[in-house]
Amino acid sequence: MTAEDFAEFAKWRYESPYEFYDSDQEPVKNPERYFAARDDDGALIGFLYFEQKEDVLEYGLGLRPDLTGRRLGLDFFRAGLEFGRDLYHPSLVQLFVAAFNERAIKVYERAGFRETGRHIRTFTRWGEVEFVSMDEQR
């Protein structure tokens, strides 16, 4: 992603309860792990995040707020997953999603991911937030 992409992403605002995913305006750590997703006209529609740890690939993503809730998530998720697999060749793909985000969890389950655990992370702005760990079942 370019500096302009990160600046645009920082302006994205999600409706409740998804405002948890709004940018905190802090510089992104490890920007080289982020990839821009664009439509046919070149407009930024989302981002992909990958972190490889040995043969396990952590996958994260975000879809532009005005595109959420329109049944685009599964195709977007699968396209990003294929991109990550082609780039990193992992033996396992895993992700972490806020437990309240049932909409995303359903998408990930439809894509073949299953819950493998839960953990709590503490945020200055949000306090304690439960996350679901999910692994791809192949």
Please report, for each region that a protein language model flagged, where it lies by residue:
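Acetyl-CoA-dependent GNAT
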Residues: 3-68, 77, 83, 87, ...
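Alpha-helix termini
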Residues: 59, 73, 84-86, 125, ...
